[in-house]
Regions:
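Active-site mouth of glycoside hydrolases
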Residues: 1-110
Length: 110
């Protein structure tokens, strides 16, 4: 985040997927070795931590979801599929709202 702030960025976009947002398992990302502050967090907790970290540098955050699952691209054009129901999509957005929308620098969702 420091790099982004130093280069003049004032907003970043965090893409997510519904399946991972609904998971209660800790994230398993190879990049967490460098970002030790993300180790052991769930997917929603990871986004909250990243938004909080961005806030320290005055960076705004936009959350976007264009995938039902991590590998679902381009998909069939719907916001749900055989693995992720419409109810799951609503639950996922509910998690985003509950966990992240109170964070001052989360300014938009898509």
């Amino acid at each position: 985040m420091q790099f982004l702030a130093e280069k003049g960025f004032n907003a970043i976009r965090f893409p997510f997927n519904h399946k991972s947002m609904l998971s209660t398992d800790p994230i398993e990302l190879p990049g967490t070795l460098k970002a030790k502050f993300l180790r052991g967090l769930t997917y929603p907790q990871m986004f909250l931590r990243l938004a909080q970290h961005a806030a320290k540098y005055g960076i705004l955050v936009m959350l976007t979801c264009h995938r039902t699952t991590p590998g679902a691209w381009p998909g069939d054009g719907l916001w749900h599929d055989k693995d992720i129901s419409e109810e799951d999509v609503l639950d996922s957005w509910g998690i985003v709202a509950d966990e992240l929308c109170a964070q001052w620098n989360v300014f938009a969702v898509d």
